[in-house]
Amino acid sequence: MRVSGRPMLLALLLLLSTVGDRGRAQSRGPADRQTLLRLLVELVQELKKFHIGDSKRLQLLGESDFALGRREATDYGADQEEQRVEIVPRDLRMKDKFLKHLTGPLYFSPKCSKHFHRLYHNTRDCTIPAYYKRCARLLTRLAVSPMCMER
């Protein structure tokens, strides 16, 4: 938890001024005032050093960690083929089981097999596991379409 130095400094000054002369019968001399002043100045300097240290720590974690270096900046976006994400097909039996679980048994007539294969093997919805629910919906719509209902 971070506490600002000013309220703490004001609290110390208030505390020192209220204690005052209770413990002493005689008034303070100039030497006591100088030591009190020196103590307060040292306290303020320590607080400043503490805050400067905090700001340096925050600065170290700041922009310099996330900035691209000269070499990284030139490599970024250099070759489009290297940045292309290659989707590795998962186990095709698992894909088939999952889609059968979502759709139930589907029948496609021979007239519709070309459309089925295009949809099943070439669309994003049926090749990326995150979109299998969309694929199941598309396959059921294809299966009940008038073109595919004929046997």
UniProtKB/Swiss-Prot annotation:
A Pfam cross-reference name: ALKL1_2
Q: Name one GO cellular component term.
A: extracellular space
- Signal sequence region: 1-25
The record's keywords, sorted A to Z, are:
Cell membrane, Cytokine, Disulfide bond, Membrane, Secreted, Signal
The cellular location(s) given in this protein's UniProt record come to: Secreted; Cell membrane
Q: What domain of life does the native source organism fall in?
A: Eukaryota
Q: Name one GO molecular function term.
A: receptor signaling protein tyrosine kinase activator activity
Which cysteines are disulphide-bonded? C112-C148, C126-C135
Q: Which GO terms describe its biological process?
A: cell surface receptor protein tyrosine kinase signaling pathway; positive regulation of ERK1 and ERK2 cascade; positive regulation of ERK5 cascade; positive regulation of neuron projection development
First-listed, main subcellular location of the protein, grouped into a coarse class: secreted
Summarize the protein's role: Cytokine that acts as a physiological ligand for receptor tyrosine kinases LTK and ALK, leading to their activation. Cytokine-binding is sufficient to activate LTK. In contrast, ALKAL2-driven activation of ALK is coupled with heparin-binding to ALK. Stimulation of ALK signaling is involved in neural development and regulation of energy expenditure.
Q: Which family does it belong to?
A: Belongs to the ALKAL family.
Complex formation: Homodimer.
| Family annotation (PANTHER family) | ALK AND LTK LIGAND 2, ALK AND LTK LIGAND 2-RELATED
Q: This protein is called what?
A: ALK and LTK ligand 2
Q: Which organism is it from?
A: Mus musculus (Mouse)
